[in-house]
């Protein structure tokens, strides 16, 4: 297939029709809104479903295993984006890959909606991991195809798109969480499946008219010989996994440990390859060296942020006073706090950085602030933990904890991908999105091992130790920021 030039793509996309933006933004906004609705809705109740007793409609895992499974699931979702990016570049193009990913996700939620089967759960996890890996890294790329690089609407277009992500994430726990916890878990998972179906319908009905050629390019097509070899390799791996599970060689515990190792090993291999590559010159290797402490800092940040959906979700279920003046809260509703605070504070941060202009903090300093705020979000939880494990505490403690970590996220996350693309060697530019996603994959791989300590040690020690480590790491990064900035060789 011949490569399609950017000019042809732009000409094929109607440039007006959605608040002054290309009409294709409507398609991608609502597709991603419903995909995030399905994902965050499912995630809001999945942990509870895993550890709820079977007589009450759950799968009956112990809490430590349930938290580890959630962390490994999250890690694999981010690892799978490497495969999703590769398939888009070599086989399907980004738009087709997004659509196929949505289909996998929908069937994954349908499998979860099947009552009382651990087999259905494992099948659903495979489908959702594969589907999210296909969709997540590619839908943003299609948004980029709608604009020229010089288009002044480009940044605001991405802002509108990310608003769709956060609106989906905000509404999902409230709707899916209520259905799942108040009525039936499988009804909640079914609602998540319907959400993804609506996203697919919007995409299918409006794609041809709104997206034109956007996302249809396959920049580096796979040869027939390579495709056959890859297909055979995938089949062999799948058979090996099935045999390992059936024979008891691959247990849940071993699988969790294996993914934890991969979550750390894959980024290390990435960095070794880039540092030893002859395609990277001295300046690029200096910038890459500057990126290493930022990468480590991001892993620390996401390790705390992602525990909002695991450890803090358990805390909300067991330790928070959920009855307020006769009004009953659902513990899953706390998962709406993160996107709610992002929607509220993201415009304020955007205004602040614009107002400060050249006086705004450098990227290493922004990372430092984000990591310190994440640490403080756990330090705050030490105070309610002092009341003992039997005491029910005010929900405001969790609200404050989520607020602090979101403020940190708004310092670190928006500049994370940007600085990754700037500091990665040019020869590896295609892998920059995957590099940034690997910070989250590594964080959740670590969480799978660390989170098991929550029930084994005092809560004050758990929150206090992790919070203190994060604050110290943020402080070290702050002290090193002038050195890191020099090594960045002019990159802001």
From Swiss-Prot:
<dbReference type="GO" id="GO:0055085">
    <property type="term" value="P:transmembrane transport"/>
</dbReference>
<dbReference type="GO" id="GO:1904680">
    <property type="term" value="F:peptide transmembrane transporter activity"/>
</dbReference>
<feature type="transmembrane region" description="Helical">
    <location>
        <begin position="367"/>
        <end position="387"/>
    </location>
</feature>
<feature type="transmembrane region" description="Helical">
    <location>
        <begin position="392"/>
        <end position="412"/>
    </location>
</feature>
<feature type="transmembrane region" description="Helical">
    <location>
        <begin position="434"/>
        <end position="454"/>
    </location>
</feature>
<comment type="similarity">
    <text>Belongs to the major facilitator superfamily. Proton-dependent oligopeptide transporter (POT/PTR) (TC 2.A.17) family.</text>
</comment>
<feature type="transmembrane region" description="Helical">
    <location>
        <begin position="232"/>
        <end position="252"/>
    </location>
</feature>
<dbReference type="InterPro" id="IPR050171">
    <property type="entry name" value="MFS_Transporters"/>
</dbReference>
<keyword id="KW-0472">Membrane</keyword>
<keyword id="KW-0812">Transmembrane</keyword>
<feature type="transmembrane region" description="Helical">
    <location>
        <begin position="110"/>
        <end position="130"/>
    </location>
</feature>
<feature type="transmembrane region" description="Helical">
    <location>
        <begin position="67"/>
        <end position="87"/>
    </location>
</feature>
<dbReference type="InterPro" id="IPR005279">
    <property type="entry name" value="Dipep/tripep_permease"/>
</dbReference>
<feature type="transmembrane region" description="Helical">
    <location>
        <begin position="464"/>
        <end position="484"/>
    </location>
</feature>
<feature type="transmembrane region" description="Helical">
    <location>
        <begin position="255"/>
        <end position="275"/>
    </location>
</feature>
<dbReference type="Pfam" id="PF00854">
    <property type="entry name" value="PTR2"/>
</dbReference>
<feature type="transmembrane region" description="Helical">
    <location>
        <begin position="185"/>
        <end position="205"/>
    </location>
</feature>
<dbReference type="GO" id="GO:0022857">
    <property type="term" value="F:transmembrane transporter activity"/>
</dbReference>
<dbReference type="InterPro" id="IPR036259">
    <property type="entry name" value="MFS_trans_sf"/>
</dbReference>
<dbReference type="InterPro" id="IPR020846">
    <property type="entry name" value="MFS_dom"/>
</dbReference>
<feature type="transmembrane region" description="Helical">
    <location>
        <begin position="88"/>
        <end position="108"/>
    </location>
</feature>
<dbReference type="InterPro" id="IPR000109">
    <property type="entry name" value="POT_fam"/>
</dbReference>
<feature type="transmembrane region" description="Helical">
    <location>
        <begin position="157"/>
        <end position="177"/>
    </location>
</feature>
<keyword id="KW-1003">Cell membrane</keyword>
<feature type="transmembrane region" description="Helical">
    <location>
        <begin position="333"/>
        <end position="353"/>
    </location>
</feature>
<keyword id="KW-1133">Transmembrane helix</keyword>
<dbReference type="GO" id="GO:0006857">
    <property type="term" value="P:oligopeptide transport"/>
</dbReference>
<keyword id="KW-0813">Transport</keyword>
<dbReference type="InterPro" id="IPR018456">
    <property type="entry name" value="PTR2_symporter_CS"/>
</dbReference>
<dbReference type="GO" id="GO:0005886">
    <property type="term" value="C:plasma membrane"/>
</dbReference>
<protein>
    <recommendedName>
        <fullName>Uncharacterized transporter YclF</fullName>
    </recommendedName>
</protein>
<feature type="transmembrane region" description="Helical">
    <location>
        <begin position="294"/>
        <end position="314"/>
    </location>
</feature>
